[in-house]
Amino acid sequence: MNIGISQRVDLVRNERRDSLDQNWFRILKNFKLQILPIPNLLTNPIEWIENQKIEAFILSGGNDLSFFKKSNKKEVNECRDKLEILILRYCKKKKIPVIGICRGLQIINYFFNKKINLKKNIIHVNSKHNIYPNIQEKFRFFKEKK
């Protein structure tokens, strides 16, 4: 099964780079899924998605939503927001599963016109989050390939 995953944008040496934590591949290989990072600057994202035969999406974490931080261009990426909104429209129309992680869930919430409250003075980035060690046993989202 091909899973598309969005990428954060990092500013490194005056270059804007799409990036994805390598742990995504390490963790999801147990599900026998093909993980396809989605470039943020695709000319025709829908055509690319359909050519890749993507069957589900993960909207990953990282970066702030551009709706909240117009002044900080290092953290904000409007092209990522636009891409993820386009992905959500496509998923809704085609009934394709999508899950949001951290920022990804925030954009899903925004897409469905829900309220998002900006909290200040919360240390969250680069903090440790507990997860289930045997997550595959807890959830059976995908059919296992034999």
Q: What is the meaning of each model-derived region?
A:
Residues 1-103, 110, 124-138, 142-146:
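N-terminal beta1-alpha1 cap of cysteine-dependent amidohydrolase-like domains
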Residues 113-118:
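Post-Walker A helix-loop "phosphate-sensing" segment adjacent to the P-loop in P-loop NTPases
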Residues 121:
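Glycine-rich beta-alpha loop elements in corrinoid/cobalamin-binding modules
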